């Protein structure tokens, strides 16, 4: 499996989080969940981000995931899982948080979706800043991972704005 680095994580690690959710996740109706991913170019009003085609059903779980790369090297990994019920969504977030290594981490509640949590710190090797936003919305679970230079983390207000737009997109597409 390709193990492209995402700050403290790899794409393979993100996919394995999805796989580890396993039997606790009921299958949602099949569909093109890539419409649930928010494009950072829309949020920032720029064309500075590029992304490969999204991965449908990452780790075999219903949902979508992609990695946006800014021309300056910053990345945003956007993952949305669509699960059987809100309890499964909350469980997915717990599993994702447990699988995300953030050094010198600080966690704060943020006004995004249901139970929005922002974890900030550095990649385990200390070379990148890392901010990961987790939230649920109905039966959907979302993880947004922002990486950048170690001394220049993404501003919290931008993470919250991005998360709120991601939440609004989930609501509009899933009717939650």
Model regions and ranges:
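N-terminal export and membrane-targeting signals
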Residues: 1-13
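C-terminal region of N-terminal signal peptides and the immediate post-cleavage residues
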Residues: 6-7, 17-35
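Short Gly/Thr-rich strand-loop-strand
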Residues: 37-58, 87-133, 168-176
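Short, surface-exposed beta-strand/loop micro-motifs that present aromatic residues
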Residues: 62-69, 129-137
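A short acidic-to-branched-hydrophobic micro-motif
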Residues: 65-93
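Short, well-ordered beta-strand elements
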Residues: 77-78, 139-148
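A generic structural motif
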Residues: 83-87, 147-152
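Surface-exposed amphipathic alpha-helical segments
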Residues: 149-176
